[in-house]
C-alpha cells in the first residue's frame, strides 16, 4: 500500500513484541492517523498478555481491544480442520496457519465496530503470514486499506527498532539479541532461527519450549481414553470437555511425555524453504485418536476420499485460503464423512510416542468373522478367483496386445 493513501483510523494486530510496539508510533508519524491496538488471545499464555493493554497505550495507541478467541479457535477452526485429516507436507498440524484466519476475522470486526478505514499487520515480507492475513482481509473487508509496515519502512534490524523507540521515549522490554523466533497458541509452539538455520545442526534444548525431552520423560507409560463423536474428541478419561478444554488437558499430558515434537523443513508459499521445530502435544494425541476411529468406520473409497481432502485442505489452510468456497466445501464434505466417526480410543504415552493400543466403535465395519484367516460361513475364498480375473483384466489385455 502506498503511503499517499489517506487513512483516518487503523486497527493494528498487536502482540506486545518489539515489531508491533514500533508499528504503532510509526503509523501515527507516517499516516497521521489514530491507531487502535487489537490483541488476540489464542492461548499464547498469561505471561505474553500481562500488561499488554498498558504497553499498547504507552506505545501510542488510543485504545486496546483484547479478544478471547481460544474456544472459538479450537471448536470452529482447529477441530473442523482435523476432520479433514490435514497434515501439511505429511507432518505439520498447521498450528500457526489455523490461528491466522480467526485473528484476521476478529480484527476486521473490531475495525467495523470502531469505524476504522484501515487494517495493519506486523508480518515480514518473507513469510507466509502476510498472505494469510491479507487474504483474509480481502475476503472479509475488501473495502478497507491494508498497511504492511515491514514492506514500507527502512528499519532492518532489532537495534534500529530499539533505537526508534528509545528516541521517542517509548518503553520496551525487548532485548537486543533475539536468537529464536517463536509463535505460540493453545494448539502449538513453533521455534525458528538460531541454530536451526543450518540444517546440519541438531536442535538444542532451546529449540523446544514446551515438551519434555523424550529421553528425560517418565519411565512409566500413561494411558488415556478418548471418546470421539462425529470426528471430534468430546471426553477424555470419562470426563466431558469443551474442545478447548480437551486441547489444554491433552497438552499437559502429552508435553509431560515428550509427545508432539517435529523438526521440519517446509515449503513456504512465497517460494523459499524454512526450518522449524514445532510442538503440538495435545494435537498429536487427538489426531492419532481420530485416525484410529476412521480406520474402523470409513469404507475404502470413503477413506481414500478423506485422504485426498486432507491433502488439499492442508494446502488451503497453509496458503491462507480459509475463507474461499473450495475450503468451505472441503470442510463441509469432511463434516459429512465424520458423521459416523464415533468411538473410543485408548492411547499409550511413552517417551515421545502416542500409540493407539485399543479402539472400538458401534459403527465399525471391521468384522472378526470376515477377517479371520480360518474357515467362516460368510466368505467363500473361492469367490476371490473371479474377482481377481476381472480386477486384472485390463493388465491381461495389455499384456496380450503387446505380444
From Swiss-Prot:
Annotated ATP binding sites: 13-21, 40, 122
Chief localization: cytoplasm
Enzyme Commission number(s) from the entry: 6.3.4.5
Catalytic activity, reaction form: L-citrulline + L-aspartate + ATP = 2-(N(omega)-L-arginino)succinate + AMP + diphosphate + H(+)
GO BP, sorted A to Z: argininosuccinate metabolic process; L-arginine biosynthetic process; urea cycle
InterPro entries, sorted: Arginosuc_syn_C, Arginosuc_syn_N, Arginosuc_synth, Arginosuc_synth_CS, Arginosuc_synth_type_1_subfam, AS_cat/multimer_dom_body, Rossmann-like_a/b/a_fold
Residues that hold L-aspartate according to the record: 124, 128-129
Compartments, as annotated in UniProt: Cytoplasm
Pathway assignment: Amino-acid biosynthesis; L-arginine biosynthesis; L-arginine from L-ornithine and carbamoyl phosphate: step 2/3
Family note: Belongs to the argininosuccinate synthase family. Type 1 subfamily.
Record's protein name: Argininosuccinate synthase
Organism encoding this protein: Aliivibrio fischeri (strain MJ11)
GN (gene name): argG
Amino acid at each position: 500500500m502506498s503511503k499517499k493513501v489517506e487513512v483516518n483510523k487503523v486497527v493494528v494486530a498487536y502482540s506486545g513484541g518489539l515489531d508491533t510496539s514500533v508499528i504503532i508510533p510509526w503509523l501515527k508519524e507516517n499516516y497521521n492517523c489514530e491507531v487502535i491496538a487489537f490483541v488476540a488471545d489464542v492461548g499464547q499464555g498469561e505471561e505474553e498478555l500481562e500488561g499488554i493493554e498498558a504497553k499498547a497505550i504507552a506505545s501510542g495507541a488510543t485504545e486496546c481491544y483484547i479478544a478471547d478467541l481460544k474456544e472459538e479457535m479450537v471448536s470452529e477452526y482447529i477441530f473442523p480442520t482435523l476432520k479433514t485429516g490435514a497434515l501439511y507436507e505429511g507432518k505439520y498440524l498447521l498450528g500457526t496457519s489455523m490461528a491466522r484466519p480467526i485473528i484476521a476475522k476478529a480484527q476486521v470486526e473490531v475495525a467495523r465496530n470502531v469505524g476504522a478505514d484501515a487494517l495493519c499487520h506486523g508480518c515480514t515480507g518473507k513469510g507466509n503470514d502476510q498472505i494469510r492475513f491479507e487474504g483474509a482481509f480481502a475476503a472479509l473487508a475488501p473495502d478497507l486499506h491494508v498497511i504492511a509496515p515491514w514492506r514500507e519502512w527502512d528499519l532492518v534490524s532489532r537495534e534500529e527498532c530499539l533505537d526508534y523507540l528509545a528516541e521517542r521515549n517509548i518503553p520496551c522490554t525487548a532485548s537486543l539479541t533475539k536468537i529464536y523466533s517463536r509463535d505460540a497458541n493453545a494448539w502449538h509452539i513453533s521455534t525458528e532461527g538460531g541454530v536451526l538455520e543450518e540444517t546440519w545442526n541438531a536442535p538444542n534444548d532451546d529449540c523446544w519450549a514446551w515438551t519434555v525431552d523424550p529421553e528425560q520423560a517418565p519411565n512409566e507409560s500413561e494411558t488415556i481414553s478418548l471418546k470421539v463423536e462425529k470426528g471430534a474428541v468430546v471426553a477424555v478419561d470419562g470426563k466431558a470437555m469443551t474442545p478447548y478444554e480437551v486441547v489444554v488437558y491433552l497438552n499437559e499430558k502429552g508435553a509431560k511425555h515428550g509427545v508432539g515434537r517435529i523438526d521440519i523443513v517446509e515449503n513456504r508459499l512465497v517460494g523459499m524453504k524454512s526450518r522449524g521445530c514445532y510442538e503440538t502435544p495435545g494435537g498429536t494425541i487427538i489426531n492419532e485418536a481420530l485416525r484410529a476411529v476412521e480406520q474402523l468406520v470409513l469404507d475404502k473409497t470413503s477413506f481414500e476420499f478423506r485422504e485426498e481432502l486432507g491433502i488439499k485442505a492442508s494446502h488451503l489452510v497453509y496458503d491462507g485460503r480459509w475463507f474461499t468456497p473450495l475450503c468451505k466445501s472441503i470442510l463441509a464434505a469432511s463434516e459429512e464423512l465424520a458423521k459416523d466417526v464415533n468411538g473410543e480410543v485408548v492411547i499409550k504415552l511413552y517417551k515421545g510416542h502416542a500409540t493407539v493400543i485399543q479402539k472400538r466403535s458401534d459403527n465399525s465395519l471391521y468384522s472378526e468373522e470376515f477377517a479371520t484367516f480360518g474357515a467362516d460361513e460368510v466368505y467363500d475364498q473361492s469367490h476371490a478367483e473371479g474377482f481377481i480375473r476381472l480386477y486384472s483384466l485390463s493388465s491381461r489385455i495389455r499384456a496380450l496386445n503387446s505380444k
